[in-house]
Amino acid sequence: MEVYLDNSATTRVFPEVAELMTKVMCEDYGNPSSMHRKGMEAEQYIRYAKETLAKLLKVSEKEILFTSGGTESDNMALIGCAMANMRRGKHLITTKIEHPAILQTMHYLETQGFRVTYLPVDKSGRIHLEDLQRSICPDTILVSIMFVNNEIGSLQPIAEVGALIKRMNPNILFHVDAVQGFGKFRIYPKKMNIDLMSVSSHKIHGPKGVGFLYVGEKVKMLPINYGGGQQRNMRSGTENVPGIAGMTLAAQMVYEKFDEDMDKLYELKEYFIKGIYKMEGMQVNGLIPEAVDYRSTAPHVVSVSVAGVRSEVLLHALEDKGIYISAGSACASNKPQTSETLKAIGLQKEFWDSTIRFSFSVFTTKEEIDYTLNVMYDMIPMLRKYTRRR
């Protein structure tokens, strides 16, 4: 049996999405900026995409900017807004557990003279609103907080954060990295006081290399690339029409059975975690065992620390059995360094190199979960014995 449980890294493309993209690439392949019929046919896909995504978010079509994915969207939001608003102030706020696309961009902005406050999180990976309130200064211009953490699945109180920011200073911009949240939660930027929001297609069964950035109509932001002036001069470059069409169809398909699929994912998550706790020396991160509330976390992510077994050893042992997981964020997995998220939640040092991530999708079945648990029941005691002998 082959079991893919690394859906926070990327998801399998819906077959219908692949079919549509093939049609766009082979038949409707015109440049959307061209004036002839082929160009106008391609442009229709972009118009339809903006209309569709705007309806899902309850925003205006002109507030959707297509990008190459989450990293570009994050960079565009942070650098573009920081540079455009620096006369009002040079203070930025984020958290200690953001995606590298946020943290590394913040580090870059620090070299450009900006001050950055990194908010701590509790053991469940959530910020405290009191810490945010204390951190906001007269020269704060932007706050960036992720919707769902990609490593442990912690869920931030985004609506409450947005309300707090706007109550303290309506001019502070609020950016949300929703790469792991879009398609798992119904997100309405205007209702939640979100000014900018990053989304990536390949986390919702769409193609890689495409995403979008929601930019509120009143947001002042500079472009970070220059060229032909596409997308109202905010993101130059010929639009990825097949990718945009595929992403839009994927989003539509995700929303068709939204509540049903999310209920299924939460049921699988609860079932899996109960199975994990039947083994000795196991710890699920981002949850408090005595007061488990699965709905206060993302439905698709489970971070597990396995006492006495290194994460890379377990990852490859499971791979040999056809089970594919992650030892952390795939976006930074090629770097042998300890996860900042695991440090921030206060995970014991002995677990830093013994933590793995399972992440589910609408394709995940209970049979796959049972197979994974049974393999782990047999495998982990043997790996621990081998580790002790060494």
Model-derived segments and their meaning:
Residues 1-390:
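Pyridoxal 5′-phosphate
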